């Protein structure tokens, strides 16, 4: 309440304060969606029950801060964080860990929390006011798997997908060498690796993005009609050795190893498209993680 004895100076200051509160900038700030609200909206739209035990949690930053933009990525490397910050995006949604372990726990580092690389990354996050949230488990849990949808679309294999098994495909016949070249071109991979006869004819294959594990990978190779497994990454003394032995035994089997990031990257590009269908208050952009590997020309 303003008294009739209030001085003109105080009235002016009050008027200025009200004008400031009603200014477009302040009004826009007050209506801007927070990081927590973004996640709550995702939980409501993802279409699968939310797990109590999950890695899909905030990894850094204050969930209550207003979001200026959302950067969606496969992996929140420092390079990705720098590009997100430079473009004015303060919420980073990442599929893979930010701090070097599946649980984002630095206990595996010899220096733990005192590790210099970890400290520099955390300092950058804090200095630029970034919020990092992981979206891994529930994006995979969707039916069909969100990562798989994006990868199949990027490879142009939608029409070849087995209706009974989303990970199996019947493609027009191609040699292993030609198919590997085509995949490398479509996914822009410079360091793809192949196991098997380059001239082997391929028609039936399985796609296993990321690191699905020895049991899943050999399960695919054990299927009598599967000639090729396209996968993200694996231990060489597990699936690679298994495939090599199968080939030596005379079985027509092959591997194309994409690398973890390129094997799922298009799945997070698909996630970006999906997020845009129900988040329109702020920009939502895909920030691809760069593949750090390169190979010398022999």
List each language-model region with its residue ranges.
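Bacterial N-terminal signal peptides
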Residues: 12-23
């Amino acid at each position: 309440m303003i008294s009739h004895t209030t001085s003109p100076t105080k009235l002016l200051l009050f008027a200025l304060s009200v004008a400031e509160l009603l200014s477009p900038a302040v009004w826009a700030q007050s209506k801007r969606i927070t990081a927590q609200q973004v996640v709550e909206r995702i939980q409501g739209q993802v279409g699968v029950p939310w797990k109590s035990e999950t890695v899909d949690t905030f990894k850094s930053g204050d969930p209550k801060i207003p979001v200026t933009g959302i950067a969606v990525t496969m992996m929140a490397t420092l390079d990705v964080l720098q590009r997100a910050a430079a473009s004015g995006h303060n919420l980073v949604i990442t599929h893979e860990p930010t701090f070097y372990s599946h649980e984002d726990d630095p206990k595996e580092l010899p220096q733990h929390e005192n590790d210099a690389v970890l400290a520099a990354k955390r300092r950058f996050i804090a200095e630029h006011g970034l919020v990092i949230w992981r979206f891994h488990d529930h994006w995979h849990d969707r039916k069909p798997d969100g990562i798989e949808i994006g990868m199949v679309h990027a490879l142009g294999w939608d029409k070849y997908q087995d209706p009974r098994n989303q990970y199996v495909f019947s493609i027009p016949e191609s040699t292993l060498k030609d198919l590997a070249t085509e995949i490398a071109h479509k996914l822009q991979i410079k360091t793809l690796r192949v196991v098997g006869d380059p001239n082997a004819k391929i028609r039936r294959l399985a796609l296993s993005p990321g690191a699905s594990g020895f049991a899943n990978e050999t399960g695919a190779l054990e299927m009598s009609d599967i000639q090729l497994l396209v996968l993200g990454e694996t231990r060489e003394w597990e699936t690679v050795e298994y495939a090599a032995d199968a080939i030596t035994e005379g079985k027509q089997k092959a591997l194309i190893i994409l690398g973890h990031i390129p094997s799922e990257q298009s799945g997070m590009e698909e996630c970006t498209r999906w997020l845009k269908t129900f988040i329109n208050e702020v920009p939502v952009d895909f920030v691809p993680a760069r593949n750090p590997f390169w190979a010398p020309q022999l």
